[in-house]
Amino acid sequence: MAKKLFIAEKPSVAQEFAKALKYQMSRRDGYLESEEAIVTWCVGHLVTMSYPEVYDIKYKKWSVDTLPFIPETFKYEVISSVKKQFDIVSSLLNRPDVDTIYVCTDSGREGEYIYRLVEQEANIHGKKRRRVWIDSQTEEEILRGVREAKDLSEYDNLANAAYLRAKEDYLMGINFSRALTLKYGNHVKNYLRRDRAVISVGRVMTCVLGMVVNREREIRSFVKTPFYRVTGAFGIPMGDGKEKPFEGEWRAVEGSAWNLSPLLYKENGFSEKKDAEALMEKLGAVLPSGAMSPGFSGAFLEKCEKKKEQKNPPLLYNLAELQNDCSRMFKISPDETLKIAQELYEKKLTTYPRTDARVLSSAVAKEIHKNIGGLRNFAPVSAYAVQILEENSYQKIAKTRYVNDKQITDHYAIIPTGQGFSALRSLSPASAKVYEVIARRFLSIFYPPTISQKVSLTVLVKSQQLPQGERFFASFKVLTQEGYLGVSRPSFFSSKKEEKEEKNGEEEEFSCDEAFLKVLQTMKKGEQLPLHSLSIKEGETSPPKRYNSGSLILTMENAGQFIEDEELRAQIKGSGIGTSATRAEILKKLVTIEYLALNKKTQTITPTLMGEMIYDVVSDSIRPLLNPALTASWEKGLTGVAEGTITSGEYMDKLDDFVRRRTNIVKQLHNQSILYQQFDAIAGFYQKKETAPVVKKAGTAKKRTEKKENAEG
C-alpha cells in the first residue's frame, strides 16, 4: 500500500501534524507511522555548506594567495551532530512504499531551504512532492494546508532565492573575513592586546554595525545649541470669579516684529537670552519679577479654532513592530521576542511570526469571527470579543485598510488563532504579556477610531512699544470618544503609564476637561484675557537618540530612509536590511562577538571599542558593505529571484563580480599605517567604560612588534 510521508521542521511540529491527521500512529525511532502515512522531522538544519578545505586542503590555511575563493560548484554535507536523524529521514524519503512527500517545514524561505538540502543530499527521484503552506498550527489550518498543498515545483523560485542567500553569506563571509583578517587582523589584535582577532564580516551584519557606529559618532560630534522661549501665563474666566490658568508660547509668525529675524532659533525662540528679555521688556514685562508694567496694553483672543480629530486603530503586528513594542514596553530583546512569538505559534495561540505584513488576507477576513470568538475564553479581552460579536462589527472589516491581499507575500499579520488556551498556564509572564498585546492589537481593529475635540487659541498681546502685537499660542484637547483605546490598553499597565506610552513621540498638548472645553467654545474674538506674567524658558537642542533593540529592528526594516536618491529609494521600497526571520539573530550575533553592547535594562545599543575599530577597517577597505542602500538592494534582488523577475544566473553573476572585485581590491591595499591613528581617535571614548588595558598613544604605535601581514590574526 502506497504511503504519504509528511516531513516537518522539528519534532513538536511533527506531533501537531500527526494529531491533526488523526492516523493511528505508532512511534518509531525518529518518526511516526500508520498504515496510511509516515510523519518524520528535521531538527532544524540537517545539511550545511562545506568548509573550503573540503574542496582542497590548501584552503584550510588562511592565505591571501587562495583568495578569492569562489567554487564553480558548491559542496554540501550532513551536519555530524544530526547525522542519525538525517539518515532516518533520507531512508524514509527513499522508501519504495512512499509515493507522495508532503513538505511541512516552516512556510518561508529558510524552511524551504531546510527541506531542499535534505532532498538534495538524499538523492530522491520519482516521488510526488507537495508543499504544505500554513499560517498557524491549528488543526483546521494544518488540514487546509494538506488539502490545498501545491506541487513543490511551484516553490522553485523561492528555493533558488534561499540557495542564493546562503551562497551570498558564505562567499562574503569567507572571502571578506579572511581578506580583512589577513590584512588587518594583527593590527586589531595588537591594539587590543588580545591573543587573536578574527574580523567577522557579513552582508547584513556589517551594515547594521555601521548604522550603530554612525549614530554614535553623530552623538559625539553633536554640539548642543541653547535657545530661549518666551511664554505667557494667561487665564480664562470660568465664572464665579474663578479662573483657569494656561500657558501660551510666543512664536515669530507673520506680523511679528521678529518674523524672519536672524536673532531667532527657529520660530519659537531666540538664540540668545538677551533677545528674549528684549521681547519681554517691549511687551511690558518688568524683569526679573515677571510682573506686568503700565506699558502693557492687554491680551486679546485673536483666534479660536475648533477641530475634531480622529485616530484610527494601528495596523496589526508584523514581527518588526512586535519586536519594537516589546523592546519599548517590556525591555526584552528582539531575539527574545522572536522566541516568544515562535512559542505562541507552536502552542497554537497565534499565527506565523516571521511575517512582514501588517494586514489580513481577504480569505482570512471571511472567517475572522472564529478568531474573535475564541478570544471570549481569554479573560483580559473577553468582554471586548463578546461586544464585537454582538455588534457584528467584524462584518465590514474586508473593506478596511486592515485587509489587503496586495500587501501580503508569504504570510499575513500576527494575530491570535482563538485556540490553544490550554497552553496559557504554561506561559512565562513575559510570554503571557506578549500574547495579550497581540490579542489587544487584533481586537482593536474592530473598534471605531478615537475622537478628540481640539481647540487652538491665538492670543494677541499688545503694548505701547509693540502696538501691532505679538502672538502667543496654546492648544487644548479633550477625548470625546475612547474608541479602540480601551481594548488596546494592556491589563498589566496602569492607565497613567499606558497613557504615557500611547503619547510617546506625539506632540505635547494641553489636556482639559469637558467643562473647560465648553468655556473655550463660547469665547469670542477680541475678548480680553488676563496675562499675569511673561517668563523665559531655557532649552537646548538634543543629539540623536541611540538605537534601542526595537528601533534598530524597525530601522533595518525601513532601510529606504537612508537613501537620498528618490528613484533608488522607490526601487528598494519594501526591502529592508535582512528579513523578519534574520534581523534578531544578526543583532544577537553582533552582541555575542562583542562588536555591539546591549544594555538589558534599557535595551539601548552602543558599539564597543572593537566594533568601532572593525567599522574603521571595513570603511578603509570594503566601504560598500556599510551602505544600507547596497545591502537593501541585495535583499531586493533575492525577492526578485523568489518572484521570478530575476534569474539565479543573473544574481549569481552579480554576486561573483562583487566578491571577486572587492577581495582583489583589499589584497592590493597598503593602508595599514593609518589604522593606529584611527584607533587612537576612538579609544578615548571607551577607556572609562571598558576594562581593556589603557591604549598606547599614536606616537608609540610604530614601536609595536608586528607579525607578518599575511599571518592569521
Residue ranges and their predicted role:
Residues 1-178, 543:
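Intrinsically disordered, low-complexity regulatory segments
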Residues 2-6, 28, 93, 99, ...:
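Basic, low-complexity terminal or inter-domain segments flanking catalytic cores
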Residues 2-3, 104-107, 197-198, 306-315, ...:
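Conserved short loop/turn motifs at secondary-structure junctions
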Residues 13-24, 40, 188, 194-233, ...:
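NTP-handling and nucleic-acid-processing catalytic cores
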Residues 74, 96, 137-234, 307:
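C-terminal or mid-to-C-terminal helical accessory/interaction module adjacent to the motor/catalytic core
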Residues 191-200, 212-276, 329, 353:
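C-terminal helical "lid" subdomain and adjoining coupling/linker elements of P-loop NTPases
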Residues 260-315, 323:
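Metal- or metallocofactor-binding catalytic centers and their adjacent structured scaffolds
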